[in-house]
Regions:
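Active-site core segments that coordinate phosphate-bearing ligands/cofactors
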Residues: 1, 10-174
Length: 174
């Protein structure tokens, strides 16, 4: 381990320390405010959504994370196959946190929009261009809903940034 890194790890329910007098003064805050340790964004999103045993929370953005928790006694020594994360205390103290989801979600929509919009780059006036862009995915969604599912149609997988679940593999593409 590099000498400048810490040798201990802490779960997200512990504090790293307290706000120093210098920073309290600079920020206009009282001294002694707790400073949190680092935590995973999706895990803290689940906390904000009131995750609890038996409740699945879905955090959606560039990717998606499906977060659940279970008591240690319920999990025992089992490791859940296919998910990308199972960590003691990663979401709530005293519980095992489970994470699954998609490596690509919102960024697929951004990429798709960019791919479809390249022809619009020469339209003068940002307002007209924006109006077309705003309606594009809405119209494509409407048309897709009218299509009948087919087992011999084109398949697109959400593996643009690798696969988070099932069986995480960040090198797979589809």
């Amino acid at each position: 381990m590099l000498p400048h890194l810490f040798t201990e790890t802490h779960t997200s329910d512990s504090k790293a320390g307290e706000l120093t007098p210098e920073w309290a003064d600079r920020l206009g805050l009282p001294q002694g405010i707790a400073v949190a340790v680092g935590a995973l964004d999706a895990h803290m999103g689940a906390v904000g959504a009131s995750v609890a045993p038996g409740i699945l929370t879905r955090i959606m953005g560039t990717s998606t994370c499906d977060i659940m928790v279970a008591g240690k006694d319920e999990v025992g020594g089992r490791c859940i196959k296919g998910i990308c994360g199972q960590v003691d205390g990663s979401v709530l103290p005293g519980f095992i946190g489970f994470e699954a989801g998609q490596s690509a979600f919102g960024d697929i929509y951004a990429w798709f929009r960019k791919m479809l919009a390249w022809t619009l780059k020469d339209i003068p006036g940002g307002e007209a261009r924006q109006k077309v862009l705003d309606g594009m995915l809405v119209e494509l969604t409407r048309e897709a809903q009218d299509m009948e599912p087919s087992e011999d149609g084109v398949v697109a997988l959400d593996w643009m940034n690798g696969r988070r679940t099932p069986d995480a593999d960040q090198n797979v593409k589809g």
